[in-house]
Amino acid sequence: MSRIGKKPIPVPSGVTASIEGQLIKAKGPKGELSYIVNDEVLVKLEDNIVSVTPRDQSKDARSKWGMSHSMIRNIFCGVKDGFEKKLEISGVGYRAALQGKNIQLSLGFSHDVVYKVPSDVSVAVPKPTEIVVSGIDKQKVGQIAAEIRGYRGPEPYKGKGIKYVDESLVRKEGKKK
């Protein structure tokens, strides 16, 4: 079992943190985030160090302990540096373009796919075959990147489709005669 929750979480420089009951708020140069910690977990802020402890030694409390630690660390990283996911489009005629706040994707369908981007996440298209999703909330950035990838995931034979830049594809061999 991982003991990630035992490590104290230092509040980064440039970030202010406050705890009100089970609500922890972080404010930094990129914005402001808050997280409601589960009732099974106690959170304390002392001298710019956040410590997370389970209320008791039940299995549920210990599992929420590590998750709460990771979520608090992620909101600190998000308001300080932000998060970013890069997507790569490969395939003949597959491309992306930015239309105001929306992304227009040409993915080999009979129509173009238009994805509406939420206001708290920014999307850039530096090249027609590259999409960069960035924001302060790690969950939302990952969710939007996964939704865009879901329109045309990479296929195993030619590798056409949308994939993460750091994703490795398992390629298959075509059938033999």
Swiss-Prot record:
Single Gene Ontology MF annotation: structural constituent of ribosome
GO BP term, example: cytoplasmic translation
InterPro entries xrefs: Ribosomal_uL6-like (IPR000702), Ribosomal_uL6-like_a/b-dom_sf (IPR036789), Ribosomal_uL6_a/b-dom (IPR020040), Ribosomal_uL6_bac-type (IPR019906), Ribosomal_uL6_CS (IPR002358)
KW rRNA-binding (keyword) present: yes
GO cellular component, one term: cytosolic large ribosomal subunit
Keyword Iron: no
Keywords: Ribonucleoprotein, Ribosomal protein, RNA-binding, rRNA-binding
Function as written in the Swiss-Prot or TrEMBL entry: This protein binds to the 23S rRNA, and is important in its secondary structure. It is located near the subunit interface in the base of the L7/L12 stalk, and near the tRNA binding site of the peptidyltransferase center.
Subunit structure: Part of the 50S ribosomal subunit.
The family this protein is said to belong to: Belongs to the universal ribosomal protein uL6 family.
PANTHER family: 60S/50S RIBOSOMAL PROTEIN L6/L9, LARGE RIBOSOMAL SUBUNIT PROTEIN UL6M
Name by which UniProt lists this protein: Large ribosomal subunit protein uL6
Organism per entry: Bartonella bacilliformis (strain ATCC 35685 / KC583 / Herrer 020/F12,63)
Record lineage: Bacteria, Pseudomonadati, Pseudomonadota, Alphaproteobacteria, Hyphomicrobiales
